């Protein structure tokens, strides 16, 4: 049997088996999970045409197809080819898309995902973060971590009143890594920036602020 036939047979077996083992799609993915002796830190296509995850730490027949919000968040910094990376990278990507490791060492686990460059999920139709925002009578200016280790943000100026939120883009959360100089978002001339910008640069070079309020602190670095 050639490799293609073996793969198709495996997919068919998984699909047929799934009719009897499929878990409730409302269940959450559990990472890491063990499936047939292998440990998975993210959704997988093993024996399936679509990405899926187990909803138990040890696969017992309960699983679900992965939605975008089911994927784990990026782990920064991570090791790739012996180098430490504090943000999403395109190195090694066949399609030039940003990606990240979902463990601290890609070299060791080879577990990864494509990076989300915009906010997603939540209850506000994937609207972007709004900072600063009021939450539990505090003013917040960065993404917050929930009980499932996901990072989220308010999408209105008053989370306490409106209750609207999204999951934070992977490209945004790198700003929370200790030692990463940029602060995203940062406010420059009364406008929020979520990525490096050339605005205000006489040399037309990308730069970012290292605190939320550039107009107040005037601290910045080139990207």
Curated annotation (Swiss-Prot):
Disulfide bonds join 29-53, 43-66, 74-100, 88-115, 129-153, 143-168, 182-208, 196-223. Not N-glycosylated. Residues 24-68, 69-117, 124-170, 177-223 form the Fibronectin type-II domain. Pfam families: fn2. PANTHER family: SEMINAL PLASMA PROTEIN (PTHR22918), SEMINAL PLASMA PROTEIN HSP-1 (PTHR22918:SF3). It comes from Sus scrofa. Keywords: Disulfide bond, Fertilization, Repeat, Secreted, Signal. GO terms for molecular function: heparin binding. This is Epididymal sperm-binding protein 1. Residues 1-23 form the signal peptide. GO terms for biological process: single fertilization; sperm capacitation. It is found in: Secreted. InterPro entries: FN_type2_dom, FN_type2_sf, Kringle-like, SP_Capacitation_Regulator. Its main location: secreted. GO terms for cellular component: cell surface; extracellular region. Detected in epididymal duct epithelium and on sperm membrane (at protein level). Coiled coil: none annotated. Binds to spermatozoa upon ejaculation and may play a role in sperm capacitation. Has phosphorylcholine-binding activity. Belongs to the seminal plasma protein family.
């Amino acid at each position: 049997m050639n490799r293609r036939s073996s793969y198709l047979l495996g997919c068919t077996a998984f699909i047929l088996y799934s009719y009897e083992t499929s878990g409730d799609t409302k269940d959450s993915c559990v990472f890491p999970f063990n499936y047939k002796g292998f440990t998975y830190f993210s959704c997988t296509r093993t024996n399936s045409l679509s990405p899926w995850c187990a909803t138990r730490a040890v696969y017992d027949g309960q699983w679900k197809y992965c939605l975008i919000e089911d994927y784990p968040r990026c782990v920064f910094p991570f090791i790739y080819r012996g180098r430490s990376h504090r943000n999403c990278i395109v190195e090694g990507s066949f399609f030039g898309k940003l990606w990240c490791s979902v463990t601290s060492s890609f070299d060791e686990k080879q577990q990864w995902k494509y990076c989300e460059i915009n906010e997603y999920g939540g209850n506000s139709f994937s609207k972007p973060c709004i900072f600063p925002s009021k939450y539990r009578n505090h003013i917040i200016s960065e993404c917050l971590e929930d009980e499932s280790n996901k990072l989220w943000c308010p999408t209105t100026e008053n989370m306490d009143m409106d209750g609207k939120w999204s999951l934070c883009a992977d490209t945004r959360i790198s700003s929370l890594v200790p030692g990463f100089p940029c602060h995203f978002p940062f406010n420059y001339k009364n406008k929020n920036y979520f990525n490096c910008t050339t605005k205000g640069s006489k040399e037309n070079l990308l730069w970012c602020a290292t605190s939320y309020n550039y107009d107040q602190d005037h601290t910045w670095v080139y990207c």
